From Swiss-Prot:
Residues 1194-1215 are annotated as: Leucine-zipper. SUPFAM superfamilies: Delta-sleep-inducing peptide immunoreactive peptide (SSF58026). GO terms for molecular function: protein homodimerization activity. GO terms for cellular component: cytosol; nucleus. This is Protein bunched, class 2/F/G isoform. The lineage of its organism: Eukaryota, Metazoa, Ecdysozoa, Arthropoda, Hexapoda. It comes from Drosophila melanogaster (Fruit fly). Residues 1-35, 101-317, 429-471, 553-582, 597-665, 681-750, 814-853, 908-950 are annotated as: Disordered. Residues 236-248 have a biased composition (Gly residues). Belongs to the TSC-22/Dip/Bun family. Residues 295-306 have a biased composition (Basic and acidic residues). PANTHER family: TSC22 DOMAIN FAMILY PROTEIN 1. Residues 106-165, 175-190, 553-580, 614-641, 701-734 have a biased composition (Low complexity). Its main location: cytoplasm.
Length: 1331
């Protein structure tokens, strides 16, 4: 969306749109038609439409009555019921519109050419539309409805075209612009169908459409995805959105290219070219060819998926496979959350899109699944396609780029049923995020509901709620869906409402930011797409933002600076939106402002580069388009290095947050923040960085703050930023010096938030939103300008209080404390690193280059370098985990390598961040590169890919170091031989701890993550590591887990030189996540482990944080101090061996006990843990089966009893009717006398009560049983406690155990109720006959 908006596309649309605002957003393809059709309101309305039209229950058009109304009208027509028909009619209308507005089409075309965004818009739109529909899909639909509606709008036409490829193609083709406009109209309809495909967003898109009606009901389908997709749509818009082919025919070539990304989804064939030709004919025949792929829904879908998997889409060409892996990691992290919630974390984008305007929504539509897809599609049409496929494959289990739905229920899109997404979402993130879609959706709902008006007010924020993560986070959101699902989603979703509000704000803000981001992203992606597949991959995680970040990172230095300048004016927009809270109004204003700003920006930046904008984007023109695109980029532009750092951090964070939603939101917020506080570009940039970090982590929080503060304090950028970003703001205030400070502050704040965030991207995002808001506010109040460290700590405590409580209390609290610790440590470290970091940046950059090979590490590193301290902190902030990892890297590296370690640490942080997104493929290498000692065996799939990043860590790359214990679990877990690692750490002790921790723990961590039991706790960052939100997403979680372990490690070793740092953060947070694996109660010995930090072994001292998931008993290999190294590979062989080795080796610093514990949680422990997890999974599945069977039996029994009751009642009524009046009265008297205390009715009530009690008891028992097996501690978890009251939600949100418990409880309740009913009936019957 941003892309579109930013791109010329937006401009052209602008003319049509008239109102700068909407057009800006809508601008892309849609804008023209929309502008024409909807005009300024088009965007808003569209947005609204999404909200209202979609019928999203929550978003009633009501939200934005003014704008909505138009949209509503259109959408209204295309309400769910009409959905497809309406959609088609709309599409047809659109066609006529297109015809009428050939200009729009032309504009579209120009746009599309000038900017991928345009292409994206249309191209994605089709998918998007599908997405939109999906978006509109239910719960999310509501949230995403806003977005969806936008998407819908934008993709409606397209969507239909695409969705009902055969039918719609013609329509879509009808005009990219028209399509867009139609999309607005059809969006509602489209959004419905979106939902189905929301799951596989684009691929599904088609079937979805086909099924979309059926799925439409499924509205659960994450609208987030589509929202994100919309972004892609924007990019594809030129391509007619591929499906639209002609729809965005204008951007035919681009569109076509964009389209390609869609090819990713393997099952996109549904949208066959058949439809396309028609549309294309209507639109541009030429586009057809370009959009042929699109035409063949395979390509189209692929593209969409690619877009969804921004990474794949983006850099599929470049990093076809690797990147995909990264994407996978990112996605996985986001659960392909970002793609899913991330990708529906991308949902975050969805919100973003709305924020920006309809345009973004268009993009978002596609974006949902491939937020970055928009960008991606625009950027790497061809590559995306492969990528998508790869990505699908990549996504560990989500071959289809499964959106992370936040539910444990299998997600069904058309013919496709996704059972696996859940775990991904647990990874969460993220994005994570993916798919935090459910989460995002909920948030979206909440946001929509809360911000129904907010949706409008928030501009696209209401849709933004979509995020995640995903929305990843969502943004963000989506990530959370799966990745964070355990924490964020399950817990979060349990907390969903609180966080939803946060998310809503966040998302909305994200939406705004995201919109800008989206704009930026597509550009960035374009640049990045080819240049940095890696970005793409991470983008996959932070689908939406990541590309932005990456692109920005890559181009940031080049373009960002320009972008910032160009966008400076626009930036204020977000700031201009003072009503963050009053989303409805504020959103409207914000939207207008944002759109206007975007428009201005486009005019300023985009117009000039309008035609060449595309080239600019790809080349470096990003600055122009990118600037326009990157509203927030403006800030980036100013402090390019900072921004890049920020962006990189963002990217990292995005990548890192397993849930895309959080990332996206974070990134988006950052952009919004940047836009808002863009007054001083440089300051803004810093703010941006801070905000980005904060944003990303708090993406939601900062934005809420930012928008409000921005508006209020736009003049006072610093203040606004401070308030918004709290610590970030502080940095912003002290722009240049604060860069470090800001970074540090950011890191600190983010750490507080981000720490949790990375683990639970979504959860964190949501959580952080509140905490950040609170923290930011507190920090701001406490003295936003106060020392960053101070601000960060303040923020963190606030975060802790707010965050922990609001989100999964335990995980967040756990995380928060860790965050605090980490923040403090990091702050300390940052201060050290700050000193080092300034110098380090070059080194980091160099490292970054090395890292880049890994994945955008270069950019990330650059950012990290630029923000060495920031990196540690920011990353921490962005990714508490990453920060921890960074801290660990920094600390460990510092300790081990001294000054170099700072750079290395930064690098590692970056790597960690990046790796998290790439968790599977690159995580390890990143980490490896980052910290010599801290290198974790992140590269789960790709062991030590990062190795090359750091020459010093090259050895780490050595495969020898990593032993994949494939036997342990389906996931090969690294059993890194500590002995192998010695090279990694200059300081044996520190290194060892780090290594072991990094290696063993990290690997274990990853393994654990995979297992859902991120149990790596660094001594210091143990608590951070705790946020095992990662556990939720098995595959995607990988990254997250990586992040966590990194964080843990990072914190643990963060001080590097400061052994004191070893906080031995208690990993014992009872972070019981929905996923049994997830809850590794962080109460690992690590906590107790004070981490005797030896000078030589800083905090590395025995990291007894063999955190074993209570659920999985995963004994993380505690990081014993440097002596760990002595461990022989055999240790991996057996726990006992490990224990013995640990005992024998005993860290010099760590006590023998530590060593023992450490060894206990050695690699062997990991293997054992993996096995345990496997066993748990098996038990869980068996339990689930048994429960289901039992439920079925109970249902049967209940039905039998009901039949009996009915029969008896019937008999009774017959008897009564036949009884003489006297007898009846007599009988009644007898009944009264016979059962005065309990009339049937009265009796039933007590029976029910009793039933409830037993149900609760049964639930407790069940949970205990499940908990015992899964060691989830569900029985004692709040969720379980709550389950009785909220069984439906609880079951879905809590782990399978919780679900089982819930099921059992339900069964019991039903049974008891039935029995009670039977008893009551029998009483009546007995009495009746008695008389």
């Amino acid at each position: 969306m941003f892309d579109r908006t930013v791109n010329a596309k937006f401009k052209p649309a602008s003319s049509n749109a008239g109102p700068g605002n909407n057009p800006v957003r809508r601008n892309s393809m849609l804008t023209p038609s929309r502008g024409v059709t909807i005009g300024g309101t088009g965007g808003n309305i569209r947005k609204l439409t999404k909200v209202s039209s979609l019928t999203s229950n929550h978003h009633f058009a009501v939200c934005y009555p003014p704008s909505n109304i138009y949209q509503n009208s259109n959408n209204a027509g295309s309400n769910s019921a009409l959905q497809r028909t309406t959609s088609e009619s709309l599409r047809l209308n659109m066609m006529s519109r297109v015809a009428a507005g050939a200009t729009p089409t032309t504009v579209s075309r120009a746009s599309s050419n000038s900017s991928l965004a345009t292409s994206t818009s249309t191209s994605l739109a089709p998918k998007s539309s599908s997405s939109s529909g999906g978006s509109n899909s239910t719960p999310q639909q509501q949230q995403q409805q806003l977005v969806s509606s936008n998407n819908s709008s934008s993709s409606s036409n397209n969507s239909f075209t695409k969705a009902s490829s055969p039918n719609n193609n013609g329509a879509r083709s009808v005009g990219g612009a028209a399509t867009s406009a139609a999309t607005g109209t059809t969006a509602a309809a489209g959004s419905h169908h979106h939902q189905p495909h929301h799951h596989h967003h684009h691929h599904h898109h088609h079937h979805q459409h086909h099924n979309h009606q059926q799925q439409q009901q499924q509205q659960t389908s994450l609208s987030q995805g589509h929202a994100s997709l919309t972004v892609a749509g924007g990019s594809a818009s030129a391509g007619g959105g591929g499906g639209g082919g002609s729809g965005s025919s204008s951007g035919t070539a681009a569109g076509g290219t964009n389209r390609k990304p869609k090819t990713t989804s393997s099952f996109e064939i549904t949208s066959v070219t058949v439809g396309h030709p028609k549309l294309n004919a209507a639109g541009d025949t030429g586009d057809e060819s370009a959009d042929d792929l699109d035409e063949s829904h395979t390509d189209d879908n692929s593209r969409i998926t690619d877009l969804e998997n921004e990474t794949p889409s983006m850099s599929e060409d470049t990093f076809s496979k690797e990147e995909v892996y990264y994407a996978n990691n990112a996605l996985s992290t986001n659960a392909p959350v970002i793609p899913t919630s991330s990708q529906y974390g991308l949902v975050v984008v969805d919100p973003i899109a709305p924020s920006l305007g309809q345009t973004i929504q268009n993009v978002q539509v596609n974006v949902s699944d491939n937020i970055i897809n928009v960008v991606s599609g625009a950027v790497t049409p061809g590559g995306t396609k492969k990528k998508d496929d790869i990505k699908e494959t990549q996504h560990r289990s989500e071959r289809f780029k499964v959106v992370k739905i936040e539910s444990t229920e299998p997600f069904k899109r058309g013919r496709w049923m996704c059972m696996d997404y859940l775990d991904h979402s647990s990874v969460g993130n993220g994005g994570n995020n993916n798919e935090k879609t459910g989460s995002s959706t909920s948030e979206a709902h909440a946001a929509t509901t809360d911000g129904g008006a907010a949706g409008v007010g928030a501009g696209s924020e209401a849709p933004a709620h979509k995020t995640t993560q995903s929305m990843i986070l969502p943004p963000t959101q989506k990530l959370n869906e799966n990745h964070l699902e355990a924490n964020s989603t399950d817990a979060n979703w349990n907390y969903a409402e609180q966080q939803q509000q946060q998310q809503q704000q966040q998302q909305q803000q994200q939406t705004i930011v995201g919109n800008a981001l989206t704009k930026t992203l597509p550009v960035a992606l374009r640049n990045v797409s080819r240049s940095s597949s890696v970005t793409r991959s991470p983008n996959a995680t932070v689908e939406f933002l990541s590309p932005n970040l990456l692109a920005q990172q890559q181009q940031q230095q080049q373009q960002l600076f320009d972008s910032v300048n160009a966008n400076a004016a626009s930036s204020p927009n977000p700031a201009g939106d003072p009503n963050n809270m009053d989303y409805a109004r504020t959103a409207a204003m914000q939207l207008h402002q944002t759109l206007q700003q975007l428009k201005q920006r486009e005019d300023a930046m985009d117009v000039p580069p309008g035609a060449g904008g595309y080239a600019n984007y790809q080349n470096g023109g990003d600055s122009a388009v990118g600037a326009a695109s990157n509203n927030n980029s403006a800030a980036a532009a100013t402090g390019e290095s900072q921004l890049s750092t920020s962006y990189v951090e963002q990217q990292q964070q995005q990548q890192q947050p397993l849930s895309p939603a959080p990332l996206t939101p974070q990134a988006a917020p950052t952009f919004a923040a940047v836009a808002a506080g863009q007054s001083p570009n440089f300051q803004l940039e810093q703010q941006q960085q801070q905000q980005q970090a904060t944003s990303q982590i708090d993406g939601i929080v900062p934005q809420p703050f930012n928008p409000q503060q921005q508006q209020q304090q736009t003049p006072q950028q610093s203040t606004a930023q401070q308030a918004a970003a709290a610590a970030n703001a502080t940095s912003a205030v002290t722009a240049p010096p604060p860069q470090q400070t800001s970074n540090t502050s950011n890191a600190a704040v983010t750490t507080g938030q981000g720490q949790t965030m990375p683990l639970l991207s979504h959860m964190t995002s949501y959580e952080q939103q509140q905490p950040n808001l609170g923290a930011a506010a507190a920090a701001a109040a406490a003295g936003g300008t106060a020392a960053t460290s101070v601000a960060a700590p303040q923020a963190i405590p606030t975060l802790q209080l707010q965050s922990a409580p609001s989100t999964i209390a335990d995980p967040q609290q756990l995380m928060v404390p860790q965050q605090q610790q980490q923040q403090q440590h990091q702050e300390e470290q940052q201060q050290q690193p700050q000193q080092q970091q300034q110098p380090l940046p070059p080194a980091n950059i160099a490292s970054a280059s090395a890292n880049n090979s890994n994945l955008n590490l270069t950019n990330t590193n650059v950012v990290a370098t630029g923000e060495a301290t920031t990196n540690a902190l920011t990353l921490t902030d962005e990714q508490a985990t990453a920060a921890l990892a960074a801290a660990f890297a920094t600390g460990a590296a510092a300790a081990a390598t001294g000054a170099t370690s700072a750079a290395a640490a930064t690098q590692q942080q970056i790597q960690q961040l990046q790796q998290q997104p790439n968790a599977e493929s690159e995580t390890e290498s990143f980490i490896t590169a980052s910290n010599p000692g801290g290198n974790r065996k992140r590269a789960f799939s790709n062991p030590h890919i990062g190795g090359p990043n750091d020459p010093s860590f090259m050895h780490r790359l050595n495969p020898q170091l990593y032993y994949y214990n494939k036997s342990q679990s389906g996931r090969s877990s690294f059993c890194v031989d500590e002995s192998l690692w010695p090279t990694n750490n200059p300081n044996g002790a520190v290194s060892d701890t780090n290594l072991y921790m990094g290696s063993s723990t990290d690997e274990d961590y990853e393994e654990a993550i995979d297992q859902f039991s991120p149990t790596i706790y660094t001594t210091r960052s143990a608590s951070r590591a705790i946020p095992i939100p990662n556990s939720a997403g098995s595959s995607p979680q990988h990254q997250m887990h990586h992040s966590q372990p990194r964080i843990a490690i990072g914190i643990n070793q963060m001080e590097g030189g400061g052994p004191t740092r070893s906080t031995g953060a208690f990993s014992a947070s009872p972070s019981i996540y929905a996923y049994p694996h997830s809850p590794f109660y962080a109460s690992s010995p690590e906590t107790s482990f004070g981490s005797a930090a030896m000078p030589g072994h800083p905090a590395a001292s025995s990291r007894i944080s063999f955190s074993y998931d209570p659920a999985f008993q995963r004994l993380q290999v505690p990081n014993a101090s440097g002596d760990r190294r002595p461990r022989s590979p055999l240790e991996c062989a057996s726990v006992f061996a490990a224990v013995a080795a640990a005992a024998t080796c005993g860290d010099a610093a760590g006590g023998a006990a530590d060593t023992v514990i450490s060894s206990a949680s050695g690699t062997s422990a990991v293997a054992i843990d993996n096995k345990i997890e496997q066993a748990m999974d098996l038990v869980k599945s068996h339990l689930m089966i048994a429960v289901r069977e039992e439920v079925e039996v109970l249902k049967e029994r209940i039905s039998e009893l009901m039949d009996k009751i009915n029969k008896l009642e019937l008999e009774n009524s017959i008897l009564k009717s036949n009884i003489p009046q006297e007898t009846l009265q007599q009988l009644q008297l007898q009944l009264q006398l016979a059962a005065p205390p309990a009339t049937p009715a009265i009796q039933a009530a007590p029976a029910v009560q009793s039933v409830v009690a037993p149900a609760a008891a049964g639930q407790a028992v069940q949970q205990q049983a499940a908990g015992a097996v899964a060691v989830t501690g569900v029985a004692t978890s709040p969720a379980s406690a709550v389950v009785p009251t909220s069984i439906p939600n609880g079951s879905a949100e809590n782990g399978s155990s919780a679900v089982e418990s819930a099921a059992v409880s339900v069964e019991q309740q039903v049974q008891q109720v039935t029995s009670a009913a039977a008893a009551a009936a029998s009483v009546v019957t007995a009495n009746g006959p008695m008389s």
